[in-house]
Swiss-Prot record:
Motif (GXSXG): 107-111
Function: Shows both triacylglycerol (TAG) lipase and ester hydrolase activities. May play a role in TAG homeostasis.
The protein's enzyme class: hydrolase
Name of the protein in its database record: Lipid droplet-associated triacylglycerol lipase
UniProt intramembrane annotation: 156-176
Main location: other
Molecular-function GO term, any one: hydrolase activity, acting on ester bonds
Species this protein is from: Saccharomyces cerevisiae (strain ATCC 204508 / S288c)
EC number(s) given by UniProt: 3.1.1.3
Residue intervals on the Lumenal side: 1-155, 177-304
Temperature-dependence annotation: Optimum temperature is 30X degrees Celsius.
GO biological process, one term: lipid storage
Pfam families documented for this protein: LIDHydrolase
Length: 304
């Protein structure tokens, strides 16, 4: 159950694939697809996906990194767009799916927006049964607390992705020792004893220039594309209604990337448009936006 390089896709990536330990003869296990949020590194989600497997041993679990977010990616790997990420996810999912195979697809943060796009792709193979949108940045990300700061930073420093990636590489790879960099990351993120994997994942992220460049490059596009777009939400809702797909939202009430206004508007809109039996909306103050840092086990046991 480790993150591995995946070589069967057009764009460089890694996957975490956990086979079911409880099976039914004569039928494929449901395929749970997990799409991470930005920066798209699967290392952050190893613990979470492990706990998800323990809770649902009859599922095959497939975590797919963002394109470019793998250790074997070349340092000159270009910044892949949101559409590149959508096409990439569809390609990898299709390599594990087949016609009529039951798919449960979930995404975290911008991964939730990618999930919506993936579902609407006419190239996706399989039968989507349920969609999970976890601390989702699917609309008006630029109006959130962190979105406002990110938009301002990009306005004043247009080449932000390239500047920060260079600084991060020099500082965390060349100047700081591994032990001291872990110490700084731990203190800055407040990981504590339960966030060791998050510290390791963040150090991997910060010491690979192409990861930081890809992450901030994608974030810049998120600020421009993920705005007010009820027409897109209508398309997604109609697709789910026509195909009998259940929709689940998990919101954090103290999310710095999703404003309270956006959360309320989305919740009210979906309640008006989606049949009650196919919609579940959870709002909690028990997890932050980046719940996988210290709250992975709790989130899985409480909500998934």
């Amino acid at each position: 159950m480790t993150v591995k390089e995946y070589t069967k896709s057009k764009l460089p990536c890694s996957i975490l694939n956990i086979k079911p330990t409880v099976t039914k003869s004569g039928e494929d296990a449901p395929l749970l697809v997990w799409i991470p949020g930005n920066p798209g590194l699967l290392y952050y989600y190893q613990e979470m996906l492990h706990h998800l497997h323990l809770k649902h041993p009859d599922w095959e679990i497939l975590g797919i990194s963002h394109a470019g977010m793998t250790l074997n990616a070349h340092s000159n790997t270009p910044i892949f767009s949101l559409q590149d990420q959508v096409d990439h996810q569809v390609e990898v999912i299709n390599n594990f799916s087949c016609k009529n195979r039951k798919i449960i697809i979930m995404g975290h943060s911008v991964g939730a927006y990618i999930v919506q796009k993936v579902c609407l792709s006419n190239k996706l193979v399989g039968s989507v049964q349920k969609v999970g949108l976890v601390t989702p940045t699917v609309m008006d990300i630029h109006t959130s607390e962190m979105g406002i700061k990110m938009t301002a930073a990009l306005r004043y420093i247009p080449p932000l992705a390239h500047v920060v990636s260079l600084f991060s590489y020099i500082f965390f790879y060349w100047i700081l020792s591994e032990g001291f960099s872990r110490f700084i990351i731990d203190k800055f993120m407040g990981c504590g004893s339960t966030g060791y994997q998050a510290v390791l994942s963040t150090r991997i992220f910060l010491t690979h220039r192409q990861f930081v460049r890809q992450s901030l490059g994608l974030a810049a596009q998120e600020m421009e594309e993920i705005t007010t777009n009820w027409e897109f939400q209508d398309r997604f809702i109609n697709y789910c209604e026509e195909n009998g797909i259940s929709i689940w939202f998990l919101f954090s009430s103290n999310d710095h990337w999703v404003s309270g206004k956006t959360r309320s508007h989305l919740s009210d809109y979906y309640k008006d448009k989606v049949k009650q039996e196919r919609l579940k909306i959870d709002v909690t103050d028990k997890i932050p936006h980046s719940f996988v840092v210290k709250h992975a086990e709790y989130a899985i046991n409480a909500f998934f």
